[in-house]
Amino acid sequence: MKVVAAVNGLITSEIAAFYALRFAAQHGFPLTLLHVENSLDSLEDVERSMAVIEEAASDDDVTTERILLAGNPIKTIRKYLSANRVDTLFCSTSRHRTFFQNSLRQQLTYLPLPVDLAVVQVVRLDAAHAVRNVVLPIEEDRLSVKKFSFFASFAKTYGAATEIYSVTLVDSEILAKMDIHLTRSLLSKINDHLSHYVKLARCMGIPLRIKHSVARNKIDQVLHHLSHHDFQLMIIGGSRQSGLSTLLRGNPIERLLHETPINTITFYGRDDG
C-alpha cells in the first residue's frame, strides 16, 4: 500500500502533500507524488514542489516516487488508482472559488474511488509544521472507526492532543425546554456510545477529550468553537454526492470550509456514500 499526493505546483498543494507525508510516515507507507500534465500548471513549479517534499521525506525515512502522467485528469487519476494499491489520495482545495467552478477536488468527491480521499484546505501555511491540537467535529455520536483512525493518525504523527466535539442538533422549541437533567442524560448517552474511542486513544497514547454542545445549527456552532480555541488542524468527514444534489440541497461542508479559520482535512472513505 502507498499514499498518493496530487501535486500541481501551488503552495497549497505542497502543504497538502506535506500532510500526506506525515500520514505516510505514521503508517510506514511510501509516498507517491502524482501530477497529471495540463496547460494550467507549470511543470517547473510542480517539480520544485516535489523536490521540497522529497527532501522532507528523506528526513522521515519515507520512500518517494514521482509519477507524471498525461490525459484527462479525472480519467487518468482513476485509472492510476485502480491499477495500484493505494490507501489514501491527498489533494488540495481553495476556499476562493466561483459558484459554478468544477474543480478537480469537486469532481473527485462526486465520483466513487477505490481509495480513501483526503481533501486539504490550507488557511495557514505555517500550521502544517507545528500541530499541537487536533479537533474532530461530529454530530452526536456519529463517528466511524475509519474516520477515527484517520483522525488518530494525525494526532499520533504530530504528538498532538485531540478533541472530539459533539454537536447535538435541536430546534428552538426543544432547546427552550431542555433542563439540566435532560441535558446531562442526553450527553451521558453520547459519552457511553463514544467510550470505546476513548479507550482506543488511551491505548495509543493519544490525549483525548470529548466536548459537547447543544445547538440549532451545527456549522455555526463549530465555527464559534473554533474561534474560541487553539486548534491547528480540523478533521471532518465528507460524503460523496453528485454535483446536482449539492446544487439543489446545498452542502454545509462547503460553508464550513469557506469560513473555517484553521487548516482542515475532509476525509471521504472509499465506501462512504
Language-model features: locations:
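Gly/Ser-rich helix-loop-strand patches that form or flank binding pockets
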Residues: R78-A127, L226-G273
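Short, aromatic/basic amphipathic alpha-helical patches
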Residues: D45-A56, S103-L108, H196-L200, P252
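Acidic/polar active-site rim loop that often engages polyanionic ligands
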Residues: A128-R132
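Aromatic/hydrophobic pocket-lining residues that form π-stacking "cages" and hydrophobic walls in ligand
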Residues: A20, I53, I77, F151, ...
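A short acidic, glycine-rich active-site loop
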Residues: L182-D192
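A conditional alpha-helix N-cap/helix-loop micro-motif detector
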Residues: S13, A70, S144, A215-R216, ...
